[in-house]
């Protein structure tokens, strides 16, 4: 797979936030294996740095654990190996493609899994991405479809993530979101109405990063064009930005 498909590189403070798509490649789940549906939520509350600090304090058993903290440090590290990719990029690529993990990657997965806790509040998380999630759902080129066609195809789809996924609870701190320093190249904007049961850990504080667990349930509730444009690195022209609203639990 070309390097660009494993996510962007050079994100300051958390290269895990630069991942563009494979971390959220979703697999539709149908029939008897389908997860339970999200509960009905009337209000989603904004998440703050204070909320994050309080949740960390309430889960000191995890956040004081040296193995979890070492795995978390590796996950958000900018350091790359001989392949040119970070620890998290390689881990997520292998998880998405069902490849064997090396000892270091298995340690990361085990320790991150041990540190996962429910976010505890019905809140909204934000993510900027490329169109990998659409391609995983059978849409080869969303720019050739109307908004109505996309809604008919996608709304109501329930799926599960196959790897870890980075979000921001404060969109002003995510450099890849629209309007931010590196936001011009991401054509898919995902708004996640995360229910309190969504399991996660905190990544880079400077980017208000929340990393959700492998196997997180997602259900698409809305799809629309927001009237803005992006210029992805792998495209030769600007394309309309699409917003996908999901619920997670």
What is each residue range found by the language model?
Residues 1-43:
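Juxtamembrane/interface and other helix-to-disorder boundary residues
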Residues 39-249:
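Mono-ADP-ribosyltransferase
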